[in-house]
Amino acid sequence: RRLGTAFLVITHDMKLAADLGGRTVVLYDGHVEEAGDTRALLDHPRHPYTRGLLQSAVGLNPVRDMWGIRPTTVSYTRQPHGCPFYGRCTQSLPDCAAHAPELETQPDGRLLACNRGGVLTLLECRGLRKSFGRQRVLDGIDLTLYSGEIVSLVGRSGAGKTTLARTLAGLLPLEGDGAVEFQGEAADFAALHRRLGGVQMVLQDSQAALNPRMTVRAAVEEPMRLSGCLREGAAERALEDVGLFACDSFLTRRIHALSGGQRQRVAVARALAMEPALLLADEPTSMLDPSGKANLLRMLKGLQNSRGFSMLFITHDLDSALKISDRIFRLEGGKLARLDPNDHIRVHFNGLFDAV
């Protein structure tokens, strides 16, 4: 700056780009995917590839587990005019394989090349309020969930975390002028629970959530049967996805004969069989031992990373939230506040190096 010299840095190091500031251009396969003010790109990436790079950057996320962008899911030679990121993008449409997006200027001044306008807004709620008697539990909650991210909600017991999750799932009615939109339209909760690509919920107590007299197969297939979307082999695939053997002896076992960890995985398989765009997970690990908790969280994060669904993770356990979340909010006094744990961590890292 003192010499007035332009400085062009070509790097894979996202932390270096963040430290240098200025402007950043994101390239993929020789194409500009996104370009703009560095701080704006870091705080709110609009292209799925930019977001994937930031989520993979250890220097920017010193606590979170490393999860790279998924490998390509299609075996094809990309058409000359198709989107270069199509095979790795979790929100791509068939049309993206044939038509490359134009690099267009966005309202905030950045450049973006995406046929879908960038990372999609999946769910948006405005002014959510909920009271039980004279006690106001939710007091004007505003929250936006984007496609392909994990948002964690932490707070004390009784803070209203489950109430918020059940309201977003349509299990509790909206009050006053509160509104919930799903994929840009007013949420029709009955329809969202009964279609593929909608909203599913995993409850804290799998023993209460699953009929103990049902077989494993019947429990996993039940929502698909009720929705008229049962596909051959869907139950087996869902069980294998969550690490359970989909053999006949297990499929015919009664729910009451399963261990706690197995029941919770069956509950997750039941939800994932509906291929949800949004999974609401309310304390899914609270009844598991440390090993079971770690295995279930890594399984959920792995599936989310490869399939691209969004997840709202309700938990008391901030340490677990730090490992898997893209954003974390604390619910207290009926209000949401975003947490930035990296600020605290950077302070302690700096103190550690100062002591050496």
Whereabouts are the PLM-identified features?
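P-loop NTP-binding/switch modules centered on Walker-like glycine-rich loops
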Residues: 1-63, 292-356
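Charged, flexible cofactor/metal-binding loops and thiol motifs
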Residues: 37-121, 340-356
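ABC ATPase NBD coupling module
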Residues: 40-45, 76-80, 186-200, 214, ...
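Conserved structural motif at the start of ABC-family nucleotide-binding domains
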Residues: 123, 138-140
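Conserved ABC ATPase "signature" region
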Residues: 232-249
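Conserved ABC ATPase signature
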Residues: 254-258, 262
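Catalytic Walker B motif of ABC-type/P-loop ATPase nucleotide-binding domains
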Residues: 279-282
